[in-house]
Amino acid sequence: MKYFTSEEIRENFLYFFEKKGHKKLPSSSLIPNDPQLLFTVAGMVPFKPIFWGKVEPTYTRITTCQKCLRTNDIENVGRTPRHHTFFEMLGNFSFGDYFKKEAIKWAWEFLTEELGLPAEKLWASVYETDDEAFNIWKDDIKIPENKILRFGKEENWWGPAGQTGPCGPCSEIYFDTGYTENCPDQENCTPACDCGRFVEIWNIVFTEYYSDENGNLSPLPRKNIDTGAGFERICAVTQGKYDNFDSDLFKEIIEEIQRIFGVKFRVNKSKDVSIKVIADHSRAIAFLISEGIIPSNEGRGYVLRRLIRRAVRHGALLEAKGPFLSSILETVIKKMGKIYPELIEKEALIKDISFMEEEKFFETMEKGMERLNNIIQNLNNETTLPGKIAFELYDTYGFPLDLTKEILSEKGIEVDEKEFTELMNKQREMARSASGKVEYDTEKQIYKEIDKFLTPTEFIGYDKLSSTEEVQLIIKGNSIVPQAQEGDEIELFFPKTPFYAERGGQVSDKGVIYNETFEAEVIHVKPIRNEIISHLVKIKKGSIKNGERVFLKVDEKKRKATEKNHTATHLLHSALRKVIGEHIRQAGSYVAPERLRFDFTHYEPLTQDQIKQIEYLINEQIQKAIPVNIYLKSLEEAKSMDVIALFEEKYGEVVRIVEIDDFSRELCGGTHVSNTGEIGLFKILEESSISSGVRRIEAITGFESLNYATELESIMTNLSKMLDSSRDQIPDKIEGILKTIKNQEKEIKQLQFQLATKNIERLAETPQIIEGEKVVVAQLENLEKDVHANTADILLQKLGRGVVILFNKSNNEQVSLVVKVSKDTSKKFHAGNIARKIASYLGGGGGGGPTFAQAGGKYANKVKEVIEHINDFMEV
């Protein structure tokens, strides 16, 4: 066989199909425009709408090399020759053009004539009832019948990629590597055997059907071809390698890993696993970060975090003591940057984010591994780790569950995942409760019942803030009632409403619902099921019956303030992407009349200069008084536009686009100002971290900004008077005061230390003797923490050998203690154990090592008892 480099194979494939009339397209993003998928998992994913028949193809023949990512078999990566997280898929696609005959013929032609793979080493498989494909292989390609296998749905049926979508029977091509070492029946080995001898290198899917969520099949509008050829596998077999990691795709990456760790590949099997894991995950990490994904605790960010932490763990197995991925990522970028220039463009970002995540995990991993190893030793031959321990490793040490499972599986131990999930859900529920948000159980039975006869509520609030409607239904608690009285808290339903229901981060409208004999305050408005909107109200006056007509009136002042903040949120999102980078993605938002909150993916705090730039950019758009243009498009049209959207959200077939000139364009169903000038003024109050990889900006607009400025003005005026300074002198004046305070605190510490050490010589001269060791116990008062510890140090030095126990009572009746034990004496008495026992008696806690410990307690009145009975607290 002729040797081809990976670059040549990729280029030859695309050129071959270009010659066959295919349009060559660049790889689509790893982040699909598909709410069912976290990542692009196959070459056909970007073309799902075309396969479905929802979108007409611009080209009926397309060829691509698509970057893909899968993590469903992550535990196998490194342990097998062919499992990967990131991989490339070569593809040729036909949308209602050619079908089985041409697809099979061209696959064979490329493999045997272009790449020169020996025909005798190739086998084919077809779906068990696909006689047409079988006959093409037999009669047209001339493969011997015994080399054409019929398989069932598990092997030779592809799709859908997600819960629903296009699918169909497929035909696969296998390469015979001749590797029979693992085969139990070498003479009769075929691709049906899973020994690893035969490698699937090509899959032609005859996409003829659509599968719904129940697995029901219906014919697609046209018959299509979807070819997926594993690039890594083709490179390996073309280059005469059994293992993908031995191909030139991984050569430089593995060489760099060997250089960093001083290890050799293919010498030690367990080290080979770690080398392969790091090589594979480095590619995935580089591509994910280049797509703007940041490590976090959910979604795509969680996958990235898992990959980095799994790579770090395998680095630690190769004796890494700190971050090491940077130069490996550099090698990945150098190797693949020519094909995927986004890697070169985002190189600094890739290395920065990876380094920060590595550094963070290295800080906790050693303690986490120590904790896990201790737990394993104490399992006493049990084969299941309690879920609460796995949760502790996740919550305290940052160990993703699958990493804990992988480490334990190496020792034959499982995890109680049910208990882990219960604890995780409990933590999330506590977080939800702490948020104070009104929660609706959309699955409660009464909502399921009304869903059967109520139609979706029409929202008319884009154009109207009031309307007269007929009450369709009244719910009180969990029951439908015919009427309700003053003081009742009920839910009202109408065919139409001007009240905005909470969604997309925007809070619901407030207001009133009334008629001549009835008045209710609107507390909350929420869509419950299938766009049916519930109005939670408190009856202030009178009573209400089913079928009555009432007037619905939105609080206009609150609505207008909310609109200002919502439009400002769009401006903020775009400004962040312009100032910080396009990796910024919305991670959440809260838009209310009083303020706005915007959560976004980013790996470090914003600088003051960046915050100023963002504020300036937004206020510049406000001053321009730009019209806010709102229009409707089909979802597929919107996806092809330069529009910001959370495509993992579920949108309808028609979407609403909010456009602010060329500065911002987002999919949004919320309410907005008609002109940016209405916002008035935008001011950032705070920028903070809410979780790893996610930051939050809180801001205000309009009159709230004016009130804020007025309040600051008042504070500055008062400060100026208090300091007897002009405003521009205030910073210098405060700096001078702080400097004076710092100097005085230093003097106080020195005086405290002098007073504390005054009696040291006397204490050292009259120690107690316990079990042959000198012990000094004393109580001091109101010492600074470092003075307290230093005093104990000096006292032990004076003592020479023995134990020093110093209590320090503060003004708030709390007590702290320091225990110091000389090295020789630590064989008899343990400082940490002494501190723990005393602290427990004093109603507190603490501890430390054999020679030094600190603790505290709340029962200062018990210190005297401890001193009098110190023998009882001396622990080995």
Curated annotation (Swiss-Prot):
<dbReference type="GO" id="GO:0005524">
    <property type="term" value="F:ATP binding"/>
</dbReference>
<dbReference type="GO" id="GO:0002161">
    <property type="term" value="F:aminoacyl-tRNA deacylase activity"/>
</dbReference>
<dbReference type="Pfam" id="PF07973">
    <property type="entry name" value="tRNA_SAD"/>
</dbReference>
<dbReference type="GO" id="GO:0004813">
    <property type="term" value="F:alanine-tRNA ligase activity"/>
</dbReference>
<dbReference type="Pfam" id="PF02272">
    <property type="entry name" value="DHHA1"/>
</dbReference>
<keyword id="KW-0067">ATP-binding</keyword>
<dbReference type="GO" id="GO:0008270">
    <property type="term" value="F:zinc ion binding"/>
</dbReference>
<feature type="binding site">
    <location>
        <position position="570"/>
    </location>
    <ligand>
        <name>Zn(2+)</name>
    </ligand>
</feature>
<dbReference type="InterPro" id="IPR018162">
    <property type="entry name" value="Ala-tRNA-ligase_IIc_anticod-bd"/>
</dbReference>
<dbReference type="InterPro" id="IPR003156">
    <property type="entry name" value="DHHA1_dom"/>
</dbReference>
<dbReference type="GO" id="GO:0005829">
    <property type="term" value="C:cytosol"/>
</dbReference>
<keyword id="KW-0030">Aminoacyl-tRNA synthetase</keyword>
<keyword id="KW-0694">RNA-binding</keyword>
<feature type="binding site">
    <location>
        <position position="668"/>
    </location>
    <ligand>
        <name>Zn(2+)</name>
    </ligand>
</feature>
<protein>
    <recommendedName>
        <fullName>Alanine--tRNA ligase</fullName>
        <ecNumber>6.1.1.7</ecNumber>
    </recommendedName>
</protein>
<dbReference type="InterPro" id="IPR045864">
    <property type="entry name" value="aa-tRNA-synth_II/BPL/LPL"/>
</dbReference>
<dbReference type="GO" id="GO:0006419">
    <property type="term" value="P:alanyl-tRNA aminoacylation"/>
</dbReference>
<keyword id="KW-0820">tRNA-binding</keyword>
<dbReference type="InterPro" id="IPR050058">
    <property type="entry name" value="Ala-tRNA_ligase"/>
</dbReference>
<feature type="binding site">
    <location>
        <position position="672"/>
    </location>
    <ligand>
        <name>Zn(2+)</name>
    </ligand>
</feature>
<dbReference type="InterPro" id="IPR002318">
    <property type="entry name" value="Ala-tRNA-lgiase_IIc"/>
</dbReference>
<comment type="similarity">
    <text>Belongs to the class-II aminoacyl-tRNA synthetase family.</text>
</comment>
<keyword id="KW-0547">Nucleotide-binding</keyword>
<dbReference type="InterPro" id="IPR012947">
    <property type="entry name" value="tRNA_SAD"/>
</dbReference>
<dbReference type="InterPro" id="IPR018163">
    <property type="entry name" value="Thr/Ala-tRNA-synth_IIc_edit"/>
</dbReference>
<dbReference type="InterPro" id="IPR009000">
    <property type="entry name" value="Transl_B-barrel_sf"/>
</dbReference>
<keyword id="KW-0648">Protein biosynthesis</keyword>
<dbReference type="InterPro" id="IPR018164">
    <property type="entry name" value="Ala-tRNA-synth_IIc_N"/>
</dbReference>
<comment type="function">
    <text>Catalyzes the attachment of alanine to tRNA(Ala) in a two-step reaction: alanine is first activated by ATP to form Ala-AMP and then transferred to the acceptor end of tRNA(Ala). Also edits incorrectly charged Ser-tRNA(Ala) and Gly-tRNA(Ala) via its editing domain.</text>
</comment>
<keyword id="KW-0963">Cytoplasm</keyword>
<dbReference type="InterPro" id="IPR023033">
    <property type="entry name" value="Ala_tRNA_ligase_euk/bac"/>
</dbReference>
<dbReference type="InterPro" id="IPR018165">
    <property type="entry name" value="Ala-tRNA-synth_IIc_core"/>
</dbReference>
<dbReference type="GO" id="GO:0000049">
    <property type="term" value="F:tRNA binding"/>
</dbReference>
<keyword id="KW-0479">Metal-binding</keyword>
<dbReference type="Pfam" id="PF01411">
    <property type="entry name" value="tRNA-synt_2c"/>
</dbReference>
<feature type="binding site">
    <location>
        <position position="566"/>
    </location>
    <ligand>
        <name>Zn(2+)</name>
    </ligand>
</feature>
<keyword id="KW-0436">Ligase</keyword>
<keyword id="KW-0862">Zinc</keyword>
